[in-house]
A protein has these predicted regions:
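Cytoplasmic-entry segments and transmembrane alpha-helices of multi-pass inner-membrane transporters
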Residues: 1, 58-97, 153
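Transmembrane alpha-helices
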Residues: 2-8, 80, 84, 131, ...
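A structural signal for multi-pass alpha-helical bundles of membrane permease subunits
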Residues: 13-18, 90-103, 128-131, 140, ...
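Periplasmic/extracellular loop-to-transmembrane helix junction in inner-membrane transport proteins
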Residues: 13-54, 66-67, 71, 114-115, ...
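Interhelical loop and adjacent transmembrane-helix boundary motif
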Residues: 18-32, 191, 197-240, 247-248
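Membrane-interfacial helix termini and adjacent extracytoplasmic/periplasmic loops
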Residues: 24, 31-35, 70, 90-130, ...
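C-terminal transmembrane helix and the adjacent membrane-cytosol boundary/short C-terminal tail
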Residues: 59-70, 142-153, 157, 164-168, ...
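Membrane-cytosol interface at the C-terminal ends of specific transmembrane alpha-helices
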Residues: 115-157, 183
Length: 249
């Protein structure tokens, strides 16, 4: 009963209110106006989630190969980004990127009037995403690697399976479910990430989260309901998949 009340107050009633706003203020151009932000959210979410997963996988493998105290400390430092507010992280990344841009402008043959090479590109946004959500992917992948017995790795090394071949033929098949979970979790977080996206995005490059922020800042809560529902549906995807997987197992 208590859990039902919490679910009702925290999820069901807000979703019903969003649906009421969408129906009451529906306009013909609402969906078409959201197509580009929705596409941007999907693209940056998928690309960012895959990049975060790849970096996390390499870090976990490196940690398993080097069990020294230095490697452990370095691993923990690289996963601190999740504890840092997105706006603070965006500013922290923007400062060295701006300095690097100034150096590049001095040495690269750029046209007059060019004020940035890296700033305002998706590269900066993706770099910030990797730092921010690396811990989320690492925790999921580390859980999967606990099922990889050291004897399997030793046998592969004896058979001269090393480097990229070891990752492709041993690690990935054994932890592919954990890799999928990592991608899904990061994807959902990227879909609703706003501060980093707002501060590092290219000009006029909106996502659903940025569009919601713009509507709410102007007090247009009804217009923000439709993109909010889309993000909620995206967040329900991993919940449904995890529940199906748990029922199967």
């Amino acid at each position: 009963m208590y859990c039902g009340v919490i679910l009702l107050v925290s999820f069901v009633l807000p979703v019903i209110q969003l649906i009421v706003w969408v129906v009451a203020h529906w306009q013909q151009g609402d969906v078409s106006a959201l197509l580009q932000p929705m596409g941007n959210s999907l693209v940056i979410g998928l690309v960012g989630a895959v990049l975060v997963m790849v970096v996390a996988l390499l870090l976990v493998i490196a940690k398993r190969s080097d069990k020294s105290l230095f490697a452990t400390i370095l691993m923990r430092i690289t996963t601190l980004g999740y504890a840092i507010p997105g706006s603070v992280l965006a500013i922290g990344i923007f400062i060295p990127i701006a300095a690097m841009d100034n150096l590049l402008l001095q040495f690269l043959p750029v046209s007059d009037g060019t004020t940035a090479v890296i700033k305002g590109t998706l590269i900066v946004m993706l770099l910030a995403y990797i730092i921010r959500f690396l811990a989320l992917a690492v925790s999921s992948i580390e859980a999967g690697f606990e099922r990889v017995r050291p004897s399997l790795v030793e046998s592969a090394v004896i058979l001269n399976v090393r480097g990229v071949a070891l990752i492709r033929r041993l690690y990935i098949p054994l932890v592919k479910s954990s890799l999928g979970v990592a991608v899904l979790m990061v994807f959902v977080d990227l879909m609703k990430e706003m501060p980093i996206t707002l501060m590092t995005r290219p000009s006029d490059w909106d996502t659903l989260a940025v569009r919601i922020y713009a509507f709410t800042m102007e007090g247009q809560f009804q217009q923000a309901a439709l993109p909010a529902l889309v993000i909620i549906l995206a967040g329900l995807l991993p919940v449904i998949l995890f529940s199906k997987e748990s029922n199967v197992t």
